[in-house]
Amino acid sequence: MGRASVFENRKWVPLFAGSAALSWACAFPLIKLGLADFGIAGTDTGGKALFAGARFLLAGLVVLAVAKLCGRSFAVPRGKTRWQLVLFGLVNTALHYFFFYLGVSNSPGGRASILDSLGTFLLILAAAVVFREKLTLRSIFGCLLGFSGIVLINLGSTAGQFTLSGDGMLLCSSVCAMAGGLLTRVVTRKMDPLVATGHSLALGGALLIPAGLLMGAHPVGVRLQGLL
């Protein structure tokens, strides 16, 4: 019997989960710093799409390189799975992060992180419908508590007025994140999860780059500091 992966060891789950949460929290200020580093204005939609595309294309290639070094299988079943992988990249990366970058750049960081968390609650509910997963009292209570927090934040006196360019884009991002989460379950049943993630990031980034150029983005000198 083969040795279990460290990722399957329950003792390490809190560490990995905490690291993932911390990394995701850092995304909000780092995106703002990156946009500022490249001089991308708040109204420059094309520039934001180009910036996001460059970052995700680079991230996807790095993930695929790691997968190769780890000896992961790159086999992609023919037929429907390949189209599902393309849809995965379009929804989970291209559309999700197009809306996400627009929203984050036009919304306060703390508020953006709270609105973005809506995707998690939507995914729990959607998975119960699509995959017939049982909703426990704990998960229902968690969703209600989370939704209540989002509503209170947006109704609070310090929240400011709802904006389509900020809050609206983040809500669209959350819906795409929910759809991407469902597609993740479908695609990773038929191919390696790490390889699927790498393909999704690279493909989504490759779609965002020409989209940004078509929207009038003007490429500037690439700086690794800004991309990171």
Question: What are the residue ranges of the model-derived segments?
Answer:
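Transmembrane alpha-helices of multi-pass small-molecule transport proteins
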Residues: D37-A94, L122, A126, C176-L183, ...
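Cytoplasmic-side transmembrane-helix entry/capping segments in multi-pass membrane proteins
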Residues: V13, A17-G18, G79-L87, L135-F147, ...
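Structural motif at transmembrane-helix junctions in multi-pass transporters
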Residues: F38-L50, F98-D116, D192-L194
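Hydrophobic/aromatic residues within transmembrane alpha-helices
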Residues: G34, F51, G103, P108, ...
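Glycine-/small-residue-enriched transmembrane alpha-helix faces in small-molecule transporters
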Residues: M1-G53, A159-V186, A206-P210
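Specific transmembrane alpha-helical segments of multi-pass solute transporters/efflux pumps
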Residues: S23, L64, K68-A112, D116, ...
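Hydrophobic transmembrane alpha-helices of multi-pass small-molecule transport proteins
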Residues: V63, L125-A126, L135-G156, S174-V175, ...
